[in-house]
Amino acid sequence: MKRTIESPRSVLLLYEMSRNGITEVSMKHIYLNLKRFDVPVELGGVNRLAPVPEWGKVIVEKTQGALKQYDPAKVEFVQFLPEAHLLTAVAALEENSPILLGSQGVFRDNTAPGGNFGAFTTNRPASIVRALGCKATLIGHCEERNDKKGILAEAGVSDMSAVNRLLNKEVKCAIASGLKVVYCIGETSEEQPEWDKVLGEQLSVGLEGVDKPQVVIAYEPVWSIGPGKTPADKDYITKIARFVKEQTGGMDVVYGVGLKSDNAKMLASIDEIDGGLIALTRFQGEIGFYPEEYLEIIRLYLGE
């Protein structure tokens, strides 16, 4: 996030100055989305790391020591875990740990004194996410967007902009509970010819009435996800990141479709990109997430 800058116009001015080599004052954001990598291999998952009850704790323990070498004024590390692992992960945090923990989403409604006291069966209100020890949440990930689109389609709803309105409620609930938000946007292959319209609506509707300094944008080129798909190249990512900054007054933008060892240096070379979202660290052989590979990706991206 940009430092000591108040208004969106001044943030955008600082971004333009940075592009022209005049100055640069930015925070890097390294996010980790652990999805459901906790599912054991014998059940169809990719977890070879630890027994399920210890999985979240092990990840924190194997990463927080090495991350202490980085300046917390220059880079933040947030790990987004499935809810079942948050308590053990929080318990594993050392004093002054460089790791912040986050949830993989929040519900669009919340508890409140004198209001709903917790009638949210199956749902995850932002209040409990904060109470569990989380500092951030992930909202609008392409997998969440696809789920919401599927539910709306089953209900016969053709207005897919409703997804952005639902996500806007989630963002507001998260911020009201004191959580930072990583808000994901992205276009499918069908939407790519009108990428600017699609992304513009995701930004304008999803962030309507939102306290933007509490939000970082994660860009997911959904059309590039999956085996055999061509990854977005540097020029395309740069174009989108510039568009997002121009539309939002200079909000921070991270690459959301896998910061990994083979693209870390390329992404680090893009001035408009402020970090990335790591997920799987190994894509062949024993596919999965491995803490030592996560740390190597960070080293490659930060150049340290």
Language-model segment annotations:
Residues 13, 21-101, 108-114, 218:
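Conserved N-terminal beta1-alpha1 strand-loop-helix module at the mouth
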Residues 28-34, 77-79, 101-104, 137-139, ...:
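Hydrophobic faces of well-ordered beta-strands that scaffold small-molecule active sites
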Residues 35, 141-147, 272-293:
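Glycine-rich phosphate-binding active-site loops on the catalytic face of alpha/beta enzymes
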Residues 82, 129, 220, 267:
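Conserved, mostly hydrophobic/aromatic
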Residues 105-160:
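Glycine/small-residue-rich loop that forms an oxyanion/phosphate-binding "nest" at active or ligand-binding sites
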Residues 143-228:
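Conserved anion-binding
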Residues 154, 283-304:
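C-terminal helical cap(s) of enzyme catalytic domains, especially alpha/beta-barrels
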Residues 259-272:
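Catalytic cores of alpha/beta
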